[in-house]
Structures are given as structure tokens and as C-alpha cells.
């Protein structure tokens, strides 16, 4: 059933009776870990989320960040890991649909999607099956609703062979006056619009709150309908000014939606379930209550404004019903053909008891003594790694130009840049990052690294970071070491957000990411959003013929958890790179002072200095000659100089630039030296083939 004995006792005690079948379904769904966050919310409360430009932070379906006077941006991240493991096409597609609907709840028009994807090794048949279907699911849904996929990252690791991590972020924009009013009064109607309810997604939230053991029920997987998703986008554009509130009907179905609405507004709900429009007339009332049928929204509207909503719903042929209303009481009341089937106090409906699990620290092993390998072979191995490879074969399957807002396209720069036509040349810069190896070795420092990396990506392109959302994905919290890793990851995010002065305005926790008793490497993704005053000045990761090549920052001998250590030596050990927050903030100021004066820029991160330089050569189609030993460094080992993933660094190119000059761009060959010694030489076309996924 999904409820613990203690939870059942609390329910019986508070109700003063045995719960009905519908109430048991209600609590099983809404008190699941997926919906209630009962093992995590006490830690998440510590995350800083406020700033003068944050209009609405965590706590509702989507935040709002002011990027110009009267212009708001909303962005939100969602995971769909368990569904994507079992039915990768529909799991990924419904993940995209769900995050789009979250953005619709604030009246925003979705303008972009980003995806952070983690799969098993690309040569593994099962991982390849998941990979290809996830990509197709994202592509089909995004393309059909007209929202471009503008960026993301793809990671490959054996831990994700059977338990992929599938994260989708949606960005939307809305004028302040178009945001729904945000208040509710007794007598206001609850209108359910979209697909008729059926049995699809039954128990989806409970399914996402347990580990995978093989042979999972496909009935728990929702099915996407992008045509209806597009209709809902069109409806919201027309009615956001006349409705009071919009709520996504997602995880937990009506049970969660009604519990959250009554809790947010401290008002009772009276809901006649038999008046709900359905596609499956044989569905039981308790099934309708927790069904996670996709492409549905709840609109809260006053009776006098109802014609405004009904006109739009009819115009776009969106099915709807008016089964509920708000009342002046302290209860969630659900009726079925005149009979009460749910009668729960609001405080109990949304009051899953919190759980603090035991914690057990993990101590990573130190890096053993490793010989310095033949450098040219080591470079080839790292550059051909799927994790650092160019992902053109993936993003070319997405329509990233629909809406003609994408100023910096996938593969062109460190982050996506989106035009905001409402305010001239003003644009958004957005990027998501994660490194499961880092968060495995040191979850606190690893989570902070994910934040810093996304922050630096936004900064290097030319954005001023404003806000962040995060996604924490771990195994079962009942495992002391897993729960410790989760808590440490939250502390790392808290530290980074505080030091960088970038509030965390939303997030998602996904637990029980295990297969056959084996938890995944903890994976913390952070998406940072910033703004740029003039999108035409955004930096791309390239250079022009004759440009000088500069490096900013110091390379340290930091190869713990690095691509080099894993791919060349087969070792996962050490600690992630250290962080100097002041140095990271300085990068924002430096790049801002050079905007429009340099040809391009890219950060130095995964795969180290050699990878950053190689990507710029490929993007440009122009070679160059670089003396890496001119780069400021605190290591004497050449392999560490090339492959260290130290923070606080970026490459800039142009006639002049910030930092230390280490080379020049020209010709068709990528030539790397140390002093007068040649250490690596490849043609740009050969390099491109080497780094293709």
C-alpha cells in the first residue's frame, strides 16, 4: 500500500475512524516521498531563496524572477527518472510536458527547454535503447508543442545503465500584469481542463518512491499527448489575466492538487469526483483521485469570470469540467454521487510526518601514485570520451530554432542565449551542469562544483547570474550513506548559493534511484539563469584566424574525479576541485568588461585545458598553436596541467584579451607545445572526428 504502520496510526487517530478506500489512495499517493518530501524538506528549507529580483520563490509550481521592469521569467526543473527507466519514450515525453505545464501555472509562455541526461555506456545495448527512446521522446514532444530544446548536457556512466537520470528544465516569460491574481476566495470554482481522466499513471508517485527491481508495471507510466499540451499553452495565453490561479495536475493527481491548494490558501475544498470528465468510465473513484493522466491543468476562477475561461477552452477544443469549489472550512471533501468518500482536515491532508533517517559518512580513497602516460595517447583518450565529446548527434534531433529566440545555439557556446523580444536586445543566459563522480566522492563539494560550473558557464557567455534551480537524485534514503550524501549535497548547494549570492528559487528531489539493490552515484544538477543586456555581444566558444588565445585563472594539480583519471587510469578517487568563490565572482566582472571586445570565450572544466582548446578549434574550423606551459599553474606535471579540472578558469580569444596569452589561432592544424617541445598535433577535421559522439 505504501503507507508505514506509523502513518496509518496517525491517520486513524486524526480521523477518529478507519480511512475509506479513497482516503487510503489519497494518503498513499500524496504522502509518498515523491509528493510529500517527507525525508528531505527539513533540509531543503535551509537553501537561500530570496533576493530583490525574486518575485516568487520556492513553494508553488513555478517561481518568478524579474529581469526587467514589469517582465518576469519563470524556470523550473523536473526529473522523470523512474518512468524513463521503464518506458523511456513516454517517460521522457511526459517529463517535458509536465515541466511545461508548471511554467504555465504563472501565466508564462514557454520559450525554451533544457535537458540534463545521464545514461549507461553508449555501447551497452540496454543503455542505448533507453538513450535513443529518451531522445526521441523529448524531441517529439518539444517539436510538436513548439518549444525549442536549446541546451543541456549528456553524461555516460555504468551506474545509469538501468536507472537513467532524465531532467528537463523549462524557461518561460510573462509580463507582470499577465500573472494570475494568486488569491482565492470561498465560492471560487475549480475547473479541470485537458484530457479526460483514465487509469494511466495510476500509482505513479508511489512508483517513483521505491527502487526498481525489474518487471515494473507499465500502468504506472503516463502517456503524453503533445497536441493537447499545445492547446493548453494557447488557452493560458488567453486566460491568465482573468483566472485567479493555475495548478498543474501532475504527480499525485487530484489528491496532491487538492491537498496543496487547500493548504496554500487555507480554505476548504468541496470536490464532486463524479462530475469530473473522464475517458475511462469504468475507473473507480479512488483511481480517478490519484490518476496521473497527462495534459491537465486546474484553473481557479470566480463565477463571474467563468465565461472568459469557458470561451477559450471551447475555442481550442479543450475538454473541461467544473467539479469543485473552495469553501470556508478546514477540510478537503471529495464526493462521489452524493456520498462522502474523502473527508480530511487540511492539516492532515498536507501533513505527512517528516522522517529523519540515520546517516553514515563516506570517505573517498586518495589518488594513488600514477605514472605520467604518453601524453598524445592520453589526450586522444580524453578527447574521445563520450562525456567530453561534441553532442551534435543529439542536439541536431531537436528543433532549437522554433520561436526564433535562440541567439546562441546548442554547441556554439557554454550556455544557451535567448532573445527577449519584449525588451529590445535584452536576453537570457541559461545552463545546467552536473558531475556524478564529484558528488560521489564528496557530495558537499561536488554539489557546490555543479553550482559553480553552471554559474561560470553563464558568466563566460556574458550573462549576469540571477537565480538557480537544482535537482538532487540519489538512491534510497533508508541507506545511511545515501541519506548522508543527500544532506551533504544540500549543504554544498547552500554554501554555493550563499557565497555567489544567487538564490535557489526551485528544485526537485528524486529518491530511490536504484536497480536491483544498487544505488546510482548521487547526481546533483544545477541550472543557473542570468541575463545579458545585448544578445549580439554574447560570447561563443570559438576563435578567428589570427586571434591570440588567452587563459584566465590558475591551473592546480586537481584531477580527483576527473575525466582523465577515470578514462586513462581507470581510477575513481580523490576530491573534486576546490572552489574560490571570490575568483568565480570576479569572472563575471571581467567578462562584462570585455563584452564585445573579444572573439569568443569558453570555461575550462570537464576534460581540462586541452579539452576546452580542442572544442574551440572544432567550433571555429580553425587550428592554432598553443604553448600550454605558459598557462599559470601550481603543478609541475604536464598531464595535470592538461587535464586538471580546476575551477576559476576560462579561455578568451581576440586581438586582445584578459589573462595570459598562450597561443595564436591560424591554419588547419591543432598544435600543442610545452615550451619548444611538441606534445600533440592533429588536423582540425581529425580532431572533429575524434570528438564526435
UniProtKB/Swiss-Prot annotation:
The source's domain of life comes to Archaea
Major location category of this protein = cytoplasm
UniProt cross-references to CDD domains, sorted A to Z: PurL_repeat1 (cd02203), PurL_repeat2 (cd02204)
Please tell me whether the keyword Metal-binding is annotated for this protein. Answer: yes
Family from the record: Belongs to the FGAMS family.
Q: Which GO terms describe its molecular function?
A: ATP binding; magnesium ion binding; phosphoribosylformylglycinamidine synthase activity
Query: What positions does UniProt annotate as the active site of this protein?
Result: 34, 80 (proton acceptor)
Q: Can you say what this protein is called?
A: Phosphoribosylformylglycinamidine synthase subunit PurL
Report the protein's function: Part of the phosphoribosylformylglycinamidine synthase complex involved in the purines biosynthetic pathway. Catalyzes the ATP-dependent conversion of formylglycinamide ribonucleotide (FGAR) and glutamine to yield formylglycinamidine ribonucleotide (FGAM) and glutamate. The FGAM synthase complex is composed of three subunits. PurQ produces an ammonia molecule by converting glutamine to glutamate. PurL transfers the ammonia molecule to FGAR to form FGAM in an ATP-dependent manner.
Which GO annotations describe the biological process of this protein?
A: 'de novo' IMP biosynthetic process
Matching entries from InterPro entries are given as:
PRibForGlyAmidine_synth_PurL (IPR010074), PurL_linker (IPR041609), PurM-like_C_dom (IPR010918), PurM-like_C_sf (IPR036676), PurM-like_N (IPR016188), PurM-like_N_sf (IPR036921)
Q: Pathway of this protein? A: Purine metabolism; IMP biosynthesis via de novo pathway; 5-amino-1-(5-phospho-D-ribosyl)imidazole from N(2)-formyl-N(1)-(5-phospho-D-ribosyl)glycinamide: step 1/2
> Catalytic activity annotated for this protein?
N(2)-formyl-N(1)-(5-phospho-beta-D-ribosyl)glycinamide + L-glutamine + ATP + H2O = 2-formamido-N(1)-(5-O-phospho-beta-D-ribosyl)acetamidine + L-glutamate + ADP + phosphate + H(+)
Positions annotated to bind Mg(2+) 2: 102, 248
UniProt GO cellular component terms: cytoplasm
Which residues are involved in binding ATP? 37, 76, 470, 507
Key words, A-Z: ATP-binding, Cytoplasm, Ligase, Magnesium, Metal-binding, Nucleotide-binding, Purine biosynthesis
Q: What is its EC number?
A: 6.3.5.3
User: In which residues is substrate bound?
Assistant: 79-82, 101, 222, 292-294, 510
Gene encoding the protein: purL
Per the UniProt record, the source organism is Pyrobaculum islandicum (strain DSM 4184 / JCM 9189 / GEO3)
According to the record's subunit comment, the protein's assembly and interactions are: Monomer. Part of the FGAM synthase complex composed of 1 PurL, 1 PurQ and 2 PurS subunits.
Q: Residues that bind Mg(2+) 1, according to the entry?
A: 78
Gene3D superfamilies assigned to the protein according to its UniProt record, in alphabetical order = PurM-like C-terminal domain, PurM-like, N-terminal domain
Where does this one sit in the cell? Cytoplasm
